């Protein structure tokens, strides 16, 4: 799933960069082409901003599943506590990664476009 998400983000970045270049460099584009390019740009930015939110909600289900697998083989109180602690730690780390991803993506799209040589 992460590999697919990374590929999606990379392809979104490529399409967004191409749309920006089209809109900035070629001012003689006809109206339909400009509108289509603008709509693609807006759609891609929306998808890339919303994509990390799906991972945030999947943290709970993934971590709960891992903890339940651990608990099925749980023998004794100490082992059960380790499983419970693992689930909490897993959720915390997963959410931190999701927040970090959202910030990176927002920063990428709020930067001023740079001129490529």
From Swiss-Prot:
Membrane-topology annotation of the record: Single-pass membrane protein
Compartments it resides in: Membrane
Keyword rRNA-binding: no
Positions in the Cytoplasmic compartment: 1-36
Post-translational modification: The mature peptide may be cleaved at a dibasic residue site and be shorter than the sequence shown (possibly residues 1-94).
Principal location listed in the UniProt entry: membrane
GO cellular component: membrane
Tissue: Expressed in endodermal ganglion neurons, apparently bipolar and following mesentery folds (observed in both planulae and primary polyps). It not expressed in nematocytes.
TM stretches of this protein: 37-56
Extracellular topology ranges: 57-117
UniProt keyword Phosphoprotein present: no
Top-level taxon of origin: Eukaryota
Name this polypeptide is given: Protein Aeq5-like2
